[in-house]
């Protein structure tokens, strides 16, 4: 049997564990372990208590920064106040409706997924500690109940109040606003007639076989912050959408700024029409070049160099023309990239038509009617209808003979007086040509916002996993507001920490700020002690995290 034995060496008392046994019939001991002095034993005992039994590491930086930003803007409070009745707000799983939607926004920004998968993701983050909820309780039913409590007619007012606060806090001076539309395909069954928003139409992702919803968005050109959005039926045209969206959105923006004459809305040719432009003021738009061939022929030979504030020099022509019954400023802008792409596309179409004509031959074994259909199909490629022409004859035996020729002058006209040219129209006569061009180019900020909203790694408006119009409206509100939070966070990262990179790169960097849950032995009965500790990080990441408030308080 083992026992504890004390012994001395050079006047110092030591302890060891020994075991008795008999050797050759005589009692003896063997040493099992040398324990050292009393101080050594006590120190080792205390170290054993302080060594964690378990270490759990979770991502903390991104969720902490977004949660702090949402708190600063009072996102949850604004939602709750908009839907409260008699100062009572629906609470599920210890969260109000606004708090649940904020959690959904943070999840949408960091790791887009279905509401059913939210709990599994939340367990890997510091979000449950930040918002004081139990992750397993936030099921898809939880989000369904909370989203159902938010009426569609309150969304615009909530968004406006939130944007007003952003403008105040960031001291924004709104000037040029970019407007654009896109669509998102859904997987809502055709037999489901309950929702009216999903409809079949031309889909920009090529999924014409699926029902889609449309999204109109206005962003600030300087900051790319979304200022207003509207969800609409998937089959509605861009022109009709613009006409219906314009009046309420301009009123909202006037209320936000108080100086409507300073606001200029920029939109592309898809929303331009005579009816839309007739009632417009303070705008820059593009119109379809095919409707202004004489103008292009005149301007193509008079393009002048225009230096932009970015240091780039472009070629453009400026004049005045009648647009929607009023005299407007017109700028014809040449884009080398557009010219190169259009010319390459034409050359590919010509090469394809030549191959098909060679396969067809001059004496095809077809009837005259069949030959005509085939030739018309070949001429259907872009621009070929004006370049290629043909004649069909039949001989005495009824055999078909065809003759095909091309219009070289038309080819030259397309290459020199049409390709690469954009026509811009504005009522901002006091602006310089460079200002008009830069305002139009700023319309790409709305397109960039749509790219982010379709990014499967963040925001990802689709797939929606919702099947009613009300849920689709609230889901889109969550996605757009998440985009607002991340864009604002990115703006602050650039300003406060000199961050260089995309919004996705910023979230990835902040996600690397991790928090450890250390479960310690206490040496006593009862629950083990749990403490939080931030993992070590490089100085650049720490600087970024501290600037954005992405390091959680552990007290």
Residue ranges of each PLM-predicted region?
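Anion-binding and metal-coordination hotspots
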Residues: 3-16, 24-28, 83-555
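Conserved glycine(s) in the ABC-transporter nucleotide-binding domain "signature"
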Residues: 1-99
């Amino acid at each position: 049997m083992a026992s504890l034995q004390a012994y001395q060496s050079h006047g110092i008392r030591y302890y060891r564990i020994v075991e008795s046994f008999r050797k050759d019939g005589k009692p003896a001991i063997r040493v099992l372990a040398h324990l050292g002095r009393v101080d050594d034993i006590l120190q080792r005992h205390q170290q054993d208590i302080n060594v964690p039994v378990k270490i759990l590491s979770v991502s903390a930086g991104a969720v902490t920064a977004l949660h702090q930003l949402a708190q600063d803007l009072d996102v949850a409070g604004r939602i709750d106040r908009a839907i409260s009745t008699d100062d009572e707000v629906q609470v599920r799983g210890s969260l109000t409706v606004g708090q649940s939607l904020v959690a959904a926004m943070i999840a949408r920004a960091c790791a887009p997924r279905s509401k059913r998968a939210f709990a599994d993701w939340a367990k890997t983050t510091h979000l449950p500690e930040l918002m004081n909820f139990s992750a397993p309780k936030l099921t898809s039913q939880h989000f369904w109940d909370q989203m159902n409590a938010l009426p569609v007619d309150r969304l615009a007012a909530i968004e406006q109040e939130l944007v007003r606060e952003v403008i105040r806090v960031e001291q924004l001076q709104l000037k040029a606003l970019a407007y654009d539309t896109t669509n998102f395909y859904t997987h809502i069954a055709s037999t489901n007639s309950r929702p009216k928003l999903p409809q079949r139409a031309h889909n920009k992702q090529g999924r014409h076989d699926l029902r889609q919803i449309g999204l109109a968005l206005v962003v600030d050109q300087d900051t790319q912050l979304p200022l207003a959005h509207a969800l609409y039926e998937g089959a509605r045209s861009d022109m009709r959408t613009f006409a219906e969206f314009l009046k309420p959105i301009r009123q909202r923006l006037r209320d936000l700024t108080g100086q409507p004459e300073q606001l200029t809305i920029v939109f592309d040719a898809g929303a331009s029409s005579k009816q839309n432009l007739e009632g417009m003021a303070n705008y820059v738009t593009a119109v379809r070049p095919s409707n202004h061939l004489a103008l292009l022929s005149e301007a193509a030979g008079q393009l002048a160099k225009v230096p932009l504030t970015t240091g780039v020099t472009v070629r453009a022509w400026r004049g005045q023309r009648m647009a929607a019954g009023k005299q407007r400023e017109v700028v014809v802008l040449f884009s080398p990239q557009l010219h190169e792409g259009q010319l390459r596309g034409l050359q590919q179409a010509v090469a394809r038509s030549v191959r098909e004509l060679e396969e067809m031959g001059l004496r095809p074994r077809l009837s005259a009617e069949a030959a005509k259909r085939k030739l018309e199909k070949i001429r259907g490629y872009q621009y070929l209808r004006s370049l290629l022409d043909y004649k069909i004859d039949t001989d005495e035996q009824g055999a078909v003979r065809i003759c095909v020729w091309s219009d070289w002058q038309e080819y030259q006209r397309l290459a020199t007086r049409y390709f690469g040219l954009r026509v811009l129209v504005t009522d901002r006569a006091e602006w310089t040509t460079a200002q008009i061009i830069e305002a139009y180019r700023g319309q790409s900020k709305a397109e960039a916002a749509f790219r982010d909203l379709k990014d499967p790694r963040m925001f990802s408006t689709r797939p929606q996993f919702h099947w009613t119009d009300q849920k689709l409206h609230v889901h889109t509100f969550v996605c757009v507001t998440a985009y607002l939070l991340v864009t604002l966070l990115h703006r602050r990262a650039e300003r406060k920490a000199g961050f260089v990179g995309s919004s996705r790169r910023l979230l990835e960097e902040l996600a690397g700020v991790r928090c450890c849950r250390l479960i310690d032995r206490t040496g006593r009965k009862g629950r083990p002690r749990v403490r939080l500790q931030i993992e070590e990080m490089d100085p650049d990441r720490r600087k970024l995290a501290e600037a954005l408030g992405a390091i959680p308080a552990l007290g």
